[in-house]
């Protein structure tokens, strides 16, 4: 009988810990999961979720200031090219292509001084910890990681 009581108490503590972890975002969106990274020159900012679930869409917001009128290219490189399936991008780029494990999004008609915010939606197709790099033009890249639960 004492064993059953102890087992019930331990089970309650474990269940409570799982619920608290989920509420703070350890398994997806939340305080622990939400992250912001800025590149070395402080010209590009990325808001994203550190934790996600396989086959569940997640979003990233990339903010940058256009330094020269004309074409701007955003590149997203994942450690494993099969780790993510690209989804929608808003605003839509004028062209988009991939080469060597890197996804390129090209915006042709941007004006100097514009503050641009791009939303990128991706769906993780594999579980694990993935290291990624996102870059705008020739600016220093932002390295970030995501842990994807099965």
Show which residues each predicted segment covers.
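A eukaryote-biased signal for short, well-structured alpha-helical docking elements
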Residues: 1-39
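Low-complexity, intrinsically disordered segments enriched in Ser/Thr together with acidic residues
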Residues: 111-128
């Amino acid at each position: 009988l004492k064993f059953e009581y102890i087992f019930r108490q331990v089970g309650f503590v474990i269940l409570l810990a799982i619920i608290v972890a989920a509420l703070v975002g350890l398994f997806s969106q939340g305080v622990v999961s939400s992250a912001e990274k800025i590149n070395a020159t402080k010209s590009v900012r990325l808001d994203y979720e550190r934790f996600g679930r396989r086959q569940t869409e997640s979003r990233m917001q990339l903010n940058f200031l256009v330094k020269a009128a004309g074409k701007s290219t955003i590149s997203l490189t994942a450690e494993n090219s099969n780790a993510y399936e690209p989804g929608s991008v808003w605003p839509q780029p004028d062209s988009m292509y991939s080469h060597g494990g890197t996804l390129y999004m090209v915006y042709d008609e941007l004006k100097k001084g514009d503050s641009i915010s791009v939303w990128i939606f991706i769906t993780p197709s594999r579980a694990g910890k993935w290291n990624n790099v996102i870059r705008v033009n020739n600016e220093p890249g932002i390295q970030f990681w995501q842990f994807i639960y099965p």
